[in-house]
Structures are given as C-alpha cells and as structure tokens.
Amino acid sequence: MRKQILIINRVPCFFILLFFLFSLTYLNSQPPKHSEKEKIGYLLETLENSNLIFIRNGDEYSSKEARAHMQKKLEYAGNRITNVDQFITYLATKSSISGKPYYVKYPDGKKVESSIWMRELLNNLEEKK
C-alpha cells in the first residue's frame, strides 16, 4: 500500500518536472528581442547607409544628412521618446515646424513617406529575430 502511494505521488512530480524542463528549453530557444534603443539605432543606421534621397520641407538631403537631422531631433527629445513607435510617429515622419511629411526618394524617382519606409524596415527587423 505504501509503495502505491509513493508511486502515485511521484507521477505528478515527474510530469511537473518534465513540463518545467520543456518550458526552459522553449524559452532558451527564443532569440532575444531587440531593445527599443537598438531598434531606433537600426533605423538610423539603415537610413544613413541607404543612399536614398531624403525630402524634408520640399528640400532634398543625403541619407547622411537625414540621419544627422533625426539624431539631433532624438537628442533634443531626450527621455520623452521611449520606444521606436514614438520615434517614428513624432520624429521621423514630419517636420515639427511645418507639419509637412518627410519622404524618401529611390534612385528611380519613386517617393514614399518616411513613416511607411521606416515601418517596413522595422517589420523586416522583427521578422529576422
């Protein structure tokens, strides 16, 4: 009788231990998420290296100039920008003075709003992880 009780008590413990081990394996197999700061850095670096034309208030700028401008805006915003969505929405999509949207222009002349372009980059980054 005593052996039956011990066996019955061991069975749930075995399954709990097994579940715990599988959970740890699953959690360790997930790639680490990028921090919000890393995501913003990725967008800025990709912009700088894109060699696209950046259009701000109707004027064209190089991708390096665009990155410098957005970096300045980010530094000025300080801790008010806490995630990549805020960065795109408040800093990388339109002029804070005129309210006009920013655009990126491809070598073939196609223009796309910077918000769309950046959100596509962000989606690509999220899919890679």
Could you say what each language-model-derived stretch is?
Residues R2-F14:
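Bacterial N-terminal signal peptides that target proteins for export
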Residues L6, S23-T25:
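Intrinsic disorder/low-complexity signature
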Residues P12-S23:
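Bacterial N-terminal signal peptides
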Residues L27-S29:
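Boundary at the C-terminal end of the N-terminal hydrophobic targeting segment
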Residues P31-S50:
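Short N-terminal segments immediately surrounding and downstream of signal-peptide cleavage
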Residues P32, I53, G58-K129:
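Compact alpha-helical subdomains of small soluble proteins
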